[in-house]
Structure formats: structure tokens, C-alpha cells
């Protein structure tokens, strides 16, 4: 009888442990996936809209600058650098998901021409690997190798992101041609203000959803506020929930209007996009150009020599 009770107790403890482990996994997995800006991939087939706007701007509402640097021209089947700079004040702190302050992270999307893709590891030189650091790039879609995403990564370490890119070879890829191509890039620093499902993050300003008087402000145990607003005309009460993070701007007894800010705007980051152009250069065209320059130089040399020879003949005839 005692053995049976012991077995039941052990079975109960194992079942409880498994349940707790599953709950922790689900919660952790959700928080991690929601922390990445690239989870917007699930909602957009292409990160660049027909208007030219990159969809990251739908969640990162503030506008900030970025800078993209690529070579003017590259040869086929060549590895080159695309350098993205995301400047911001390193002293700034952002509001984290738990309402505390922390450093800013950065993320980026690089939209290359068809045929261009991330360089394989065996084609990357040691010098370039050192510039890249520990960054792990991935394709926006398995069938869109020309669109690369990265982030979030610590902004203090990676405010400059180096992408190793492999140019296509028209001899093996029929879709590639020796032309001038556009390159588009988007980069953000800091967390977004809106999640892909349309809900607000705690990194944005919260406005009143009704006109009336602030009847009560309840500070929640884990941070944030519940603000009770009573409409003076009909007595209707509305409760606005403020998550931890933004600073409260109103007080009890204050009259407010609909859409009036209840909090400050804690966002210190933002998103920016830019573009550049790159030429996929034909090696035969380069060789032809070099041959032309060499021909011009040789022609100039022969012309000078011929002129000197003619002057000598003239001088000789004058002496006679």
C-alpha cells in the first residue's frame, strides 16, 4: 500500500514538472519570437511595397536616417561588401518590454537585385569575416535569397553592419545581365511602436479614448496604470490601460479630451530606408576598354616619335 502511494506521488510530481516545463517553453518561445523584427516576414510576401516603402515602417513609426555603401561596379561571381550604417546616440536608453530601461538594438533588411545573394562562408575572406563579426544573416524567404534580414542585435556593437554579397554570373544564370541595378535597404534602431497584429507596444504614446474627467488612477502592482475616465454628460465610465514604461502626464480630477496624450512618448529610436546603385560589369567590356586606352596611349607615343623624326628630317634638309 505504501509503495502504491509512493508511486502515485512520484507520478504526480513528474506530471507537474512536465506541465511546468511546457508552460515555460511556450511562454519563452512566444516572447523570443515576438522580440524579433523579422517576424513581420509572416505578414508580407515582399518587404518593399509598390510605393517603394519598406514595410518595417509600419511598426517603427519614427523616421531616422540610414546610410548604405556599395561598390560602383562589380565583376560576375565576385564577393563584395554592402555596408549599412545606422547612426544614433549611444547614450540613449529605450523602454524594454518589462518597462525598464535598456540599450537599443538594431535590425535591417537588404533588398538586392535578382541573382545577388549572401556569399557562402567558403568564399568570404578572413578580413571580411572579421568585419562581419558574429552576425547571422538569413533570407527573407527560402525562395528570395536576394532579400536578407538581420536583427535584433546590440546597437553599440553593430551600428555598422557589413553584408557579404556574391554577385551573379550571367554565364551560368540566364536571368542575370550586365546592367545597372538598384539596391534598397531599411534599418531600425530601438523597438517598434506597433505589433504586426495592430496592437500597441509599451514604446509609444497612449491617448485618451474618451472625453471626460479623470476619476481615478490605479497604479498596477507589476507596473502601468488603469485610468478611469468619466464622461460628464452621461456619466459613462471608460478605463484606459497603460502598460509599464511610458510616463503618466495626467492626474486625478483633470479634464481631458479624446485623443489627448495620457503619457509621454518614450520612443528614442526609429526606422530609415535608403538606396544605392551597382553595375554588374562585363569583364570583356573592361578588357576592351583597357585595350582602347592602351591603343590611344601607343598612338600618342608613335605620334610624338613621328613628329620628332619629322623635325629631325626638316633640320637636316635646312642644313644642306
UniProtKB/Swiss-Prot annotation:
It is a single-pass membrane protein. The keyword Signal applies. Keywords: Chloroplast, Electron transport, Heme, Iron, Membrane, Metal-binding, Photosynthesis, Plastid, Signal, Thylakoid, Transmembrane, Transmembrane helix, Transport. One of its GO terms (cellular component) is chloroplast thylakoid membrane. Binds 1 heme group covalently. The gene is petA. The 4 large subunits of the cytochrome b6-f complex are cytochrome b6, subunit IV (17 kDa polypeptide, petD), cytochrome f and the Rieske protein, while the 4 small subunits are PetG, PetL, PetM and PetN. The complex functions as a dimer. HAMAP family: Cytb6_f_cytF (MF_00610). Residues 1-35 form the signal peptide. The chain crosses the membrane at residues 286-306. Component of the cytochrome b6-f complex, which mediates electron transfer between photosystem II (PSII) and photosystem I (PSI), cyclic electron flow around PSI, and state transitions. It comes from Hordeum vulgare (Barley). Its cofactor is heme. This is Cytochrome f. Heme binds at residues 36, 56, 59-60. One of its GO terms (molecular function) is iron ion binding. Belongs to the cytochrome f family. GO terms for biological process: photosynthesis. The keyword Mitochondrion does not apply. It is found in: Plastid, Chloroplast thylakoid membrane.
Amino acid at each position: 500500500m505504501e509503495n502504491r502511494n509512493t508511486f502515485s506521488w512520484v507520478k504526480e510530481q513528474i506530471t507537474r514538472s512536465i506541465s511546468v516545463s511546457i508552460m515555460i517553453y511556450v511562454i519563452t518561445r512566444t516572447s523570443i519570437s515576438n522580440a524579433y523584427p523579422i517576424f513581420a516576414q509572416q505578414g508580407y510576401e515582399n518587404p518593399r511595397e509598390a510605393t517603394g516603402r519598406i514595410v518595417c515602417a509600419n511598426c517603427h513609426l519614427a523616421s531616422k536616417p540610414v546610410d548604405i555603401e556599395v561598390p560602383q561596379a562589380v565583376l560576375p561571381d565576385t564577393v563584395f561588401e554592402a555596408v549599412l550604417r545606422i547612426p544614433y546616440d549611444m547614450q540613449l536608453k529605450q523602454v524594454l518590454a518589462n518597462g525598464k530601461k535598456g540599450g537599443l538594438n538594431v535590425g535591417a533588411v537588404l533588398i538586392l537585385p535578382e541573382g545577388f545573394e549572401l556569399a557562402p562562408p567558403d568564399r568570404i575572406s578572413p578580413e571580411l569575416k572579421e568585419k562581419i563579426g558574429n552576425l547571422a544573416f538569413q533570407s527573407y524567404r527560402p525562395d528570395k535569397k536576394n532579400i536578407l534580414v538581420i536583427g535584433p542585435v546590440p546597437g553599440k556593437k553593430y551600428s555598422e553592419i557589413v553584408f557579404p554579397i556574391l554577385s551573379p554570373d550571367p554565364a551560368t544564370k540566364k536571368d542575370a545581365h550586365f546592367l545597372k541595378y538598384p539596391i534598397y535597404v531599411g534599418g531600425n534602431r530601438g523597438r517598434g511602436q506597433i505589433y504586426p497584429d495592430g496592437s500597441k507596444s509599451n514604446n509609444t504614446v497612449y491617448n485618451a479614448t474618451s472625453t471626460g474627467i479623470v476619476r481615478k488612477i490605479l497604479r498596477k502592482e507589476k507596473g502601468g496604470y488603469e485610468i478611469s475616465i468619466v464622461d460628464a454628460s452621461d456619466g459613462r465610465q471608460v478605463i484606459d490601460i497603460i502598460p509599464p514604461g511610458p510616463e503618466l502626464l495626467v492626474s486625478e480630477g483633470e479634464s481631458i479630451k479624446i485623443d489627448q496624450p495620457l503619457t509621454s512618448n518614450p520612443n528614442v529610436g526609429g526606422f530609415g530606408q535608403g538606396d544605392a546603385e551597382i553595375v554588374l560589369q562585363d569583364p570583356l567590356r573592361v578588357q576592351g576598354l583597357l585595350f582602347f586606352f592602351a591603343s590611344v596611349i601607343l598612338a600618342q607615343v608613335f605620334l610624338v616619335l613621328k613628329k620628332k623624326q619629322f623635325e629631325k628630317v626638316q633640320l637636316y634638309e635646312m642644313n644642306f
